[in-house]
């Protein structure tokens, strides 16, 4: 959520930021509705004061049958009617303003490049060595040949975009989760938590998922939503909270299953594990002061990059343009891993700086150490990494001509010293 006071003072800057996103200007509408709202509040307060004075004067009239007493009573009645009318109008204006503000995206950072789609994103750097693999197979082909990726059985019970991992690939998934969290906690001082995967609507609103993206998540019949990312519960840990500046920054890491309806993704990545309704993800989250937030954003991104470096997976860092950046994001880096079979880079992590956007919605604040002033915090989060896509990257980049897959060196201790994943000779199902 944006600051209405800032919008009043900077209408042109708001429209400029919206224009970069390809959104029509709304500052005039916001300021007009806000002005009418404030006028209504002023009129209501004036009438309430007048009513109070008249009510006080009644107390000094001892003859309740007098004309003065009756006139004042009639005046108070008319004032009450007028206040009711104005309050109804005020509620209407507040609703209109809230609808606009709730659907207003965050301001894009000054260094975010202009662009209309992902083709205009800016590649900042490429890291790692792309191996020359002759006739590379797709991850789903490799997994099928290993006998360890089962889409058919998953589809029977859950429908499309679900998968069952078996044997060494299930073990690899578990190894990756532990490896990622160990790196983030021991090398980057993130504090591990295990949050809920079901949340109420207000928690989704606080991070910017609602109301705009209501159809992107799964909703239960009892008022809960399955989280699309651990960003939701991690951010809401600090909702309606005022922290002390000396306790900041706070860095959290969590592994959770994530659930997405993938509305609008029909026909996209229909084969394999790239786009699933359920997937595991290690999430990084930081809450910091505005002065620290840019540094913490780079720090969090470095933590996510470190996983790719340790696994020796080729990747690149991309700065998203204004037309591709998320609704709540102020600035976003995507980490894209190389997939040999697709002969291209694909997103494996998205790291975003949200400035005070989420904190304003969730009322997450801090008290300055010296001045004792209370201000809104800044939030930052990113994948560290998406586990399923990391499995995809390992299968494709570490595939061998004989159908086996080499286990990255950093994961071998987590796999009981195992160096290779070889095809199953028999399976339980």
From Swiss-Prot:
GO terms for biological process: selenocysteine biosynthetic process; seryl-tRNA aminoacylation. ATP binds at residues 260-262, 347-350. NCBIfam families: serS. Pathway: Aminoacyl-tRNA biosynthesis; selenocysteinyl-tRNA(Sec) biosynthesis; L-seryl-tRNA(Sec) from L-serine and tRNA(Sec): step 1/1. Disulfide bonds: none annotated. L-serine binds at residues 229-231, 283, 383. Consists of two distinct domains, a catalytic core and a N-terminal extension that is involved in tRNA binding. Belongs to the class-II aminoacyl-tRNA synthetase family. Type-1 seryl-tRNA synthetase subfamily. It comes from Orientia tsutsugamushi (strain Boryong). Homodimer. The tRNA molecule binds across the dimer. HAMAP family: Ser_tRNA_synth_type1 (MF_00176). It is an enzyme of class 6 (ligase). Keywords: Aminoacyl-tRNA synthetase, ATP-binding, Cytoplasm, Ligase, Nucleotide-binding, Protein biosynthesis. The gene is serS. Its main location: cytoplasm. One of its GO terms (molecular function) is ATP binding. This is Serine--tRNA ligase. CDD domains: SerRS_core (cd00770). Its EC number is 6.1.1.11. It is found in: Cytoplasm. Catalyzes the attachment of serine to tRNA(Ser). Is also able to aminoacylate tRNA(Sec) with serine, to form the misacylated tRNA L-seryl-tRNA(Sec), which will be further converted into selenocysteinyl-tRNA(Sec).
